[in-house]
Curated annotation (Swiss-Prot):
Domains as described in the record: The N-terminal and the C-terminal halves of the protein can associate with each other, thereby hindering interactions with ZYX.
Name the UniProt record assigns to this protein: Testin
Annotated organism of origin: Eulemur macaco macaco (Black lemur)
Domain LIM zinc-binding residue range list: 234-297, 299-359, 362-421
Keywords linked to the UniProt accession: Cell junction, Cytoplasm, LIM domain, Metal-binding, Repeat, Zinc
Length: 421
């Protein structure tokens, strides 16, 4: 790819969703404008997933690329135009006749994603067992939740070097090896079945990596256990509660078919969010979403949100940073060797802090420098000086003294308070 093509591709990436309104900030945001290397809006600092951007094709490409070169190729299709794998997500449309006085109208419900099972009744049961606000019905809160989790749990920059900011050839190679490794060892997609349907596999069957979804190997004797399974009590691997007869369960092949989950319990062990489209990563007997699995394997830059493949990076405030990305969150100036203040877990340089975030002294009405001592009571602050922290009536210095606060004013005595009331 030549330089002109690369620059054009980068420009198109930054034009995507340009001007889209923020669902969180509403009118406070002028519209989405992607930061050059942070994965946020330059105007409101919210993520792309917080904006009303139509990303269905992009998300389908991202998940399609995730499943490429895995056992889940049945879930993707390659476009003839560019050969890019697209995720064939299962969309479910339910039609319910609604009786009216004269006619019978049809109520149609479209799920933007549903488990890819042949039994639609089972898929419908699965959906009903999810919290209402997490059911991906088109145009609903649940559909917005799914869209947000696709962006959070499966960031494109965790699998595609071209989505990252200025990786070296060595870092690109390391990332490609890392992605190949997690595809082979951890990535999986849950299966929805009735617990009794798995009895045919036998209790001594095991998963073989690299096989197709139906591959299993018999170990030991294969005697008939049907009578034993008839009275088996199944319990959820997450909540330990029993499974009701006839309710669908989720199985994770990498975990083994001796484990099963309620639909609402198939969650990441770190963020506890539903695993979007039942895509999971299995490690140390735990389920992870893509983001938190990668976090357990590699440090993540708190500035650009990308995994760090360089040997040189910095640690500050219990977070990891690319050396070039330890910058002021407001002005992007590099902070190495500079004074900074953490604001909502983001580092801000001293000038930006004083300009944008510093509290104002109730005495002199100037911003309080972060390195200067101050007195704070409720939402009010003062410079801890003889010029500012004074009785609002007689101007007596109150440092180290008892005082009476009244709506931003402070008094040294009841008498002074009465004189000002």
């Amino acid at each position: 790819m030549d330089l002109e093509t690369k620059v054009k591709k980068m420009g198109l990436g930054h034009e995507q969703g340009f001007g889209a309104p923020c669902l969180k900030c509403k009118e406070k945001c002028e519209g989405f404008e992607l930061h050059f290397w942070r994965k946020i809006c330059r105007n409101c600092k919210c993520g792309q997933e917080e904006h009303d951007i139509l990303l269905s094709n992009e998300e389908d490409r991202k998940v399609g690329k995730l499943f490429e070169d895995t056992k889940y190729t049945t879930l993707i299709a390659k476009l003839k135009s560019d050969g890019i794998p697209m995720y064939k997500r299962n969309v479910m449309i339910l039609t319910n006749p609604v009786a009216a006085r004269k006619n019978v109208s049809i109520n149609t419900v479209t799920y933007e994603w549903a488990p890819p099972v042949q039994n639609q009744a089972l898929a419908r049961q699965y959906m009903q067992m999810l919290p209402k606000d997490k059911q991906p019905v088109a145009g609903s809160e649940g559909a917005q939740y799914r869209k947000k989790q696709l962006a959070k749990q499966l960031p494109a920059h965790d699998q595609d070097p071209s989505k990252c900011h200025e990786l070296s050839p060595k870092e690109v190679k390391e990332m490609e090896q890392f992605v190949k490794k997690y595809k082979n060892e951890a990535l999986g997609v849950g299966d929805v079945k009735l617990p009794c349907e798995l009895d045919a596999r036998g209790p001594n069957q095991m998963y073989i990596p690299g096989g197709d979804r139906s591959t299993s190997a018999a170990v030991g004797a294969m005697e008939d256990k049907s009578a034993e399974h008839k009275n088996t009590q199944y319990s959820c691997y997450c909540c330990k509660m029993s499974m009701k007869e006839g309710d669908p369960a989720i199985y994770a092949e990498r975990a083994g078919y001796d484990k099963l989950w309620h639909p609402a319990c198939f969650v990441c062990s770190i963020c506890y969010e539903l695993l979007v489209d039942m895509i999971y990563f299995w490690k140390d007997e735990k389920l992870y979403c893509g983001r938190h699995y990668c976090d357990s394997e590699k440090p993540r830059c708190a500035g650009c949100d990308e995994l760090i493949f360089s040997n040189e990076y910095t640690q500050a405030e219990n977070q990891n940073w690319h050396l070039k990305h330890f910058c002021c969150f407001d002005c992007d100036n590099i902070l190495a060797g500079e004074i900074y203040v953490m604001v909502n877990d983001k580092p801000v340089c001293k000038p930006c802090y004083v300009k944008n975030h510093a509290v104002v002294c109730q005495g002199c009405h100037n911003a309080i420098d972060p390195e200067v001592q101050r007195v704070t009571y409720n939402n009010f602050s003062w410079h801890a000086s003889t010029e500012c922290f004074l009785c609002s009536c007689c101007s007596k210095c109150l440092i180290g003294q008892k005082f009476m606060p009244v709506e931003g004013m402070v008094f040294c005595s009841v008498e002074c308070k009465k004189m000002m009331s």
